[in-house]
Amino acid sequence: ILRITIKLKHKQHWGHSIFYVGNNLVIRIKQQPRSLLLKDLTIAIDAGHGGTNTGAGGLTGVLEKNITLALSLKLQAALEALGTKIIMTRTKEEFFDNKERILFYRDSLPDLLLSIHLNSSADPIRTAGTSTFYRYIGFRPLSNAIYQRMLELGLTEAGNNGSFNFMLNSP
């Protein structure tokens, strides 16, 4: 077993990725951007699911993939109106598997990734609500701020959850 410790100069990193390029192991550590103004950020928006991956089905028969795409396109328009550079996983109805998503984000280097999903439950009458998920502890305040704004819409609380592993096992 080989153990490598990397001591960082900055207080909090904005994520990391570990991957191979040929026989080389690459460790990329992301730092906070100099400016946190929306006009200075690059934000990736992932419209969850798509194509043959329909996601959750609602009581009315509406598919998650359609709602996530519609919400993502509205979010794209709102953020672009504020001057934010947006990178979209998909802008139309198509399949985009998780491996493709991981490679897409790894290569495009967004400052933030917002992945839009809706969940289902075996008992949708009793189990409902909105939640946010973040991967790195440094993103908890941002995730919580988004969560609090969502609650202002009158949505039921389902929590701000950490250690979300969307890219944890990336190639």
Predicted region positions:
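Intrinsic disorder/low-complexity detector
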Residues: 18, 24-25, 55, 167, ...
